[in-house]
Regions:
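Transmembrane helix recognition focused on a "late"/terminal membrane span
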Residues: 1-14, 37-133
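Hydrophobic, membrane-inserted alpha-helices
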Residues: 17-22
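Active-site beta-strand/loop microenvironment that shapes enzyme catalytic pockets
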Residues: 23-31
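Alpha-helical transmembrane segments and their helix-start/interface "positive-inside/aromatic belt" motifs
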Residues: 30-38
């Protein structure tokens, strides 16, 4: 029995993009975008962690909903945040707030990147037609 040839699955690209930022684009063969997105999103996460003194991604915080959009790297940083939080967290510090915001933006950005990977595979020819004048 011959099955029709299918390309990469958009759902797999979406899930891979959540686990590792940019992996959905790598799965689709867009290596340049994959590297760019991985570096940008992971860089935002690390910059936010450094700014916030390593205590910005913690369980039980509302911000984790946004930060969790960055997927695997965000959840991998939770034990580090827990370790640094044992010595106390300066919740009112501007650097802590800015670091928290950076990590949340990384999560939201990764959600957009995941949607891009999904849409490029689900609708490969959308937007390529020129409008008739």
């Amino acid at each position: 029995m011959n099955l029709p040839a299918t390309g990469p699955s958009p759902i797999v690209a979406l899930v891979l993009g959540w686990i590792i930022p940019g992996a959905g684009h790598a799965y689709a063969g867009r290596w340049g975008k994959a590297v760019l997105f991985f570096v940008c999103i992971t860089g935002l996460l690390v910059a936010g962690m450094v700014m916030g003194g390593g205590t910005v991604i913690l369980w039980g915080q509302v911000w984790l909903l946004a930060q969790g959009g960055a997927g695997g790297p965000a959840f991998a940083l939770i034990p580090i945040s827990d370790h640094f939080a044992k010595s106390g967290v300066d919740w009112a510090s501007r650097l802590h707030e800015t670091g928290t915001l950076y990590t949340a933006v990384a999560g939201f950005l990764n959600i957009l990147v995941m949607m891009d990977a999904y849409l490029k595979l689900a609708y490969p020819h959308a937007g390529t037609e020129k409008e008739a004048a």
